């Protein structure tokens, strides 16, 4: 049954590696192919995983819910994801999922508006496109509107439009006045003449958007595998942050785009917000718990520290390994 699920739901982004030793591949599940996640691709491309004793293959899943499901089933040991409400609800109810690193500690969204809206005052009464209610784009839209001094429940109309392409089409057609846009689609929005009114990452929004998550069981049984993976990953992050030209080429491969400007937009944005030391985001998880508590007050008894394990990044940091990566550059 498990093998059938894997065969039907995943495809391998890289051909299975031929182990240099007898080590079996470590499968990392990706909830999506999107901006920020390319740091994992860079890590593999520069050989950092193999240098740290890890034979890593990437598997694409059909969203965050499936990634969490397969992680908890034991079919894969690590995922890029696990930061949203579903994951934290599962953890609170006794599931073994746990965040060991956060490498996008904010929501990578901006609010773009048409040319008639030059400032926050003119945003009042506007229609703003998101994917769906309760989504990260919804959360980001409400946060940005609030930071602009407006009440998202009264001063604007937030509309469920769909994915990024559908939201951009709605903005172009004039059926909405603004939209939540992620990088590198921010470049396309500007090229179409739309104005960036707010950037959530610059307004102080803390959120565990992209994470490395595993299970308590895997940490107990194979702590060296988790440590080796994260040691390689911080090496990949260091390369990404300090080698723009090479990283842009890898972004083009990963996102499957030919436009250098699109890849550069992604690089400029995510290299700015990707931390050198990807500690699990305690503040971000705390925000998710507060979001859940609105409808599930019982979760107020939980502490954010129960949902993360920062021991691996702490060890890498305190040993001087991470700082040493940047001294070499």
Region annotations inferred by a language model:
Residues 21-163, 167-173, 177-183, 196-200, ...:
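Short, glycine-/small- and polar/acidic-enriched structural segments
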Residues 85, 158, 165-255:
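Pocket-lining segment of extracytoplasmic ligand-binding domains
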Residues 4-16:
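Bacterial N-terminal signal peptides
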Residues 134-152, 231-263, 305-308, 314-321:
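Ligand-binding clefts/hinges and TM-proximal coupling segments of bilobed small-molecule sensing domains
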Residues 220-301:
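Secondary-structure end/capping motifs
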Residues 293-329:
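Conserved C-terminal helix/tail region of periplasmic/extracytoplasmic solute-binding proteins
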Residues 57, 157-159, 265-271, 303-314:
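Short linear loop/turn motifs
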């Amino acid at each position: 049954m498990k093998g059938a699920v894997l065969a039907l739901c995943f495809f391998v982004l890289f051909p299975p590696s031929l182990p240099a030793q007898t080590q079996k591949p470590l499968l990392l599940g990706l909830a999506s192919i999107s901006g920020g996640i390319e740091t994992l691709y860079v890590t593999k491309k520069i050989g950092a995983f193999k240098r740290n004793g890890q034979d890593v293959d990437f598997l694409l899943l059909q969203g965050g819910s499936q990634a969490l499901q397969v992680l908890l089933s034991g079919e894969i040991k690590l995922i890029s994801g696990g930061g949203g409400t579903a994951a934290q609800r599962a953890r609170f109810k006794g599931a073994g999922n746990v965040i060991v690193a956060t490498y996008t500690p904010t929501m990578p969204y901006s609010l773009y508006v048409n040319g008639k809206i030059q400032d926050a005052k003119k945003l009042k009464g506007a229609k703003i496109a998101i994917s769906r209610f309760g989504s990260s784009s919804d959360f980001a839209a409400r946060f940005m509107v609030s930071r602009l001094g407006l009440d998202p429940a009264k001063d604007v109309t937030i509309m469920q439009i769909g994915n990024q392409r559908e939201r951009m089409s709605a903005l172009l057609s004039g059926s909405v006045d603004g939209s939540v846009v992620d990088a590198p689609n921010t470049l396309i929005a500007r090229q179409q003449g739309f104005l960036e009114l707010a950037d959530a990452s610059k307004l102080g929004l803390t959120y565990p958007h992209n994470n490395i998550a595993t299970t308590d069981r895997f940490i107990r049984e194979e702590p060296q595998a988790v440590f080796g993976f994260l040691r390689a990953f911080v090496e990949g992050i260091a390369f990404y942050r300090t080698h723009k030209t090479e990283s842009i080429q890898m972004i083009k491969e990963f996102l499957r785009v030919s436009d250098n400007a699109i890849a550069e937009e992604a690089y400029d944005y995510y290299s700015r917000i990707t931390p050198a030391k990807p500690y699990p985001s305690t503040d971000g998880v705390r925000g998710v718990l507060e979001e859940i508590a609105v409808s599930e007050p019982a979760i107020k008894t939980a502490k954010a520290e129960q949902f993360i394990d920062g021991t691996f990044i702490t060890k890498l940091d305190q040993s001087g390994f991470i700082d040493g990566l940047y001294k070499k550059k």
